[in-house]
Design a protein with these regions (language model features):
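Histidine/acidic-residue-rich, glycine-tolerant segments that coordinate divalent metal ions
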Residues: 1-89, 93-100, 183-184
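Metal-dependent amide/peptide-bond hydrolase catalytic core
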Residues: 60-195
Length: 195
């Protein structure tokens, strides 16, 4: 894109349902979090629910992984940093009396700093593999880095604020300047040019 349309700076807006219409919020620095996804596949050995001793239950291992993942933010991310690990989906089996061969967890992972993003990825893989091993199962993690942190450069943010003031007065700017943990693909552009 920037090869076709070279520029010195780039500007964009993201609508925010629930915020007042006709108002603007400008957040300098990290304004929106990175967004990654992970699919954790836990492999065991299926069997009959009446004979669990003859199987390796991936559902129990997956449940343990879900609980252990909750310790990453509580015990690995520094207290003044933001890290989010959410298990949004669990898929396993089709029948109540059959232990399946596999279970799958789907995660969304958010951070504002590259160091925290790296930490979250590393710990998700470590925990998934170690917890699965406790139950005699294995786990693979397909980790996908999707959207980077949206970083608003201070000089361009100040320019945007001045444009809003000139257009709408001081009331056009919301006093709130807190970053949000949603993500935005405009962040890819701001990795290349200020904005």
């Amino acid at each position: 894109f920037l090869d076709l349309f070279p520029c010195d700076a780039m500007f964009g807006m993201h609508n925010a349902p629930g915020k007042p219409a006709g108002k603007f919020m400008a957040v300098p620095g990290a304004a929106m979090s990175s967004s990654d996804s992970a699919i954790v596949t836990v492999s065991g050995k299926g069997g009959h629910g009446a004979m669990p001793h003859a199987s390796v239950d991936p559902v129990v291992a997956a449940a343990s992984i879900v609980m252990a993942l909750q310790t990453i933010v509580a015990r690995n991310v520094p207290p003044l940093e933001v890290g989010i690990v959410t298990v949004g989906a669990i898929h396993a089996g089709e029948a109540p009396n059959v232990i399946p061969d596999t279970a799958e967890l789907r995660l969304t992972v958010r951070a504002f700093r590259p160091e925290v993003r790296d930490l979250l990825e590393r710990r998700i893989v470590e925990i998934a593999q170690a917890q699965a091993a406790v139950f005699g199962a294995t786990a693979t993690v397909d980790y996908q880095r999707r959207y980077p942190v949206l970083y608003n450069h201070p000089e361009q943010t100040a320019l945007c604020e001045q444009v809003v003031r000139d257009w709408l007065g001081d009331d056009g700017l919301m006093p709130e300047r807190a970053p949000v943990t949603g993500s935005e693909d405009f962040a890819f552009f701001l990795e290349k040019v200020p904005g």
